[in-house]
Amino acid sequence: MGRNDGDLVAGVGPLRRMLPSLMPSRNGALVYYEQQLDLSKTLPWIEARQPSITLYELAIAGLVRVWSERPQINRFIAGGKLYQRDEISFSISVKKSLDENAPLTSIKAVFDPSDTIEDTCKRVEELIERAKDHKRETESEKEMRFVTKLPIFFIRWLVALQRMVDWFGLLPRFMTRNDPLYSSAYVVNLGSVGLEAAYHHLYEYGNIPFFIVLGKVKKAPVVGDDGELSVREVVNIRYTFDERITDGFYTSTALERFREYIENPKLLDGPP
């Protein structure tokens, strides 16, 4: 039996089938992973590229490519069962402005596995510009504005009811289509506000199994392939993911593939 956002994974081994019962919550099944990416080839490539793109847009393009190549990391746990998500989607946090009191909003971007880097970057840029528009609310902002007008006890009752319906896979598509907490991963760029990457918890609401945080670009000592030590520009990326969706070896090889795409962005040129 499937859901409107994924299909039940068949042929799951007994241990993996047991994991949701042994670790019923996402935050009880967290794995932390960190990468330091060498940007010595990346930044000149970005500067020379026309039309211009940002490191964040490049990262999203790399993630889209990896998620299309390694489908097991596009799975999620719901109702104690393992599902294969039927789309590649990433949720993005956007601050309306650099003012510390400016509101933060979230948007969900859906991509096609055949998207080129140009397709992905254009999509991300459009969504971020729309989210920054103070005069225009995102779908999630409209929904939250309506719900938060209700009494607290009623909000909690609604959330509990929705989680119960979601457990049985009966939530209608319109309730999850634009919800940022129903996506392949949450991708946050703390580097855009000058901060280092941090580990973030997973949300028990929704079904996101990955949280990915990019830090600021900085200089750091790096040992090259020739064994020589040099100072290069790097970025740290920290991941939090639900180990119940697939094994650690599969996940780590997928994330190392992402490293290859960011450190050698020419690999993303052309169609997948």
Where are each of the predicted segments found?
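C-terminal catalytic/motor cores of large multi-domain enzyme assemblies
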Residues: M1-P272
